[in-house]
Amino acid sequence: MESLSLKFIEPYWFKFVDYYGEDFLITYGTFIAHEVFYFGSFIPFFLCDFMPFLQKYKIQPTKKNEWKTQFNCIFKVLMTHIFVQLPMMYIFDPAIKAIGLSARAPLPSIPYLIFTIACCFLIEDFYFYWVHRALHHGFWYKHIHKVHHDHAAPFGMTAEYAHPLETVILGVGTVIGPFLFSRDLFTLWVWLGTRLFQTVECHSGYDFPWNPTKLIPFWGGSHFHDFHHETFVGNYSSTFTYLDKIFGTSDKYYSRKQIRDSKLAAGKSE
């Protein structure tokens, strides 16, 4: 099953690790990778705002985010990355290495890598649902989570626009999966890139019908999460829909969706 192996890139990966050093890559390399993945995911959706033919896919087309609002968001997110996430990575570096994270571990097979990423999504989504739901109560919402809801019509950059404490708390759910299933840096970076693109797309404000994630069972997507920002309630999951369905926290979303779909169907039949 050599075709399902990543052995062909192992020599290049290990040369990369030898050149920069494992210590540098685990902390600072991960931070740089995070910035590249995050801003790299945001830019395509940002450019969509300048393409008139894509505006029909805007979820809240009547709400426009002013340049000042977007710049303020970008600045605050960047400050959070530099002064919260980077120090957090540095502080937890010894613990991460003690647990066994290595940049020189053999690369996983492609099937196991896909399995790991899928498990990471499921674990993070479960953790996120309950913590996010708790953050919508009393003190936690008023003093912490309300920051993330500054934007009722989200755009890509708002994905990590949050109170510093929320950044730390929700960040825990992101790292649980990789340390349970694979403690190699390569897998961590693949998961990080996948998760960051997912959360930026989820906050993008666009719902493209050709998005391949629509083929994934129980996948929420941007339309599902946008409702949460618009109404401030329900749809608490980060990725999937099954927990919201089980616990009835997406009932309002599906009721409104049913009404909207009925109106669209009636309009087409006329």
From Swiss-Prot:
Record field: transmembrane: 31-51, 82-102, 110-130
Short motif (Histidine box-2): ranges: 145-149
Motif (Histidine box-1): 132-136
Motif Histidine box-3: positions: 224-230
Keyword presence, Endoplasmic reticulum: yes
UniProt cross-references to InterPro entries, sorted A to Z: Fatty_acid_hydroxylase (IPR006694), Sterol_Desaturase_Related (IPR050307)
Any GO CC annotation of this UniProt entry: endoplasmic reticulum membrane
Pathway(s) served: Steroid biosynthesis; zymosterol biosynthesis; zymosterol from lanosterol: step 3/6
Biological processes annotated in GO: sterol biosynthetic process
Assigned keywords, A-Z: Endoplasmic reticulum, Iron, Lipid biosynthesis, Lipid metabolism, Membrane, NAD, Oxidoreductase, Steroid biosynthesis, Steroid metabolism, Sterol biosynthesis, Sterol metabolism, Transmembrane, Transmembrane helix
Compartments where found: Endoplasmic reticulum membrane
Catalytic activity reported: 4,4-dimethyl-5alpha-cholest-7-en-3beta-ol + 6 Fe(II)-[cytochrome b5] + 3 O2 + 5 H(+) = 4alpha-carboxy-4beta-methyl-5alpha-cholest-7-ene-3beta-ol + 6 Fe(III)-[cytochrome b5] + 4 H2O
EC number(s) stated in the UniProt entry for this protein: 1.14.18.9
Membrane topology: Multi-pass membrane protein
GO molecular function: C-4 methylsterol oxidase activity; iron ion binding
Written domain comment of the UniProt record: The histidine box domains may contain the active site and/or be involved in metal ion binding.
The protein's name in its UniProt record: Putative methylsterol monooxygenase DDB_G0269788
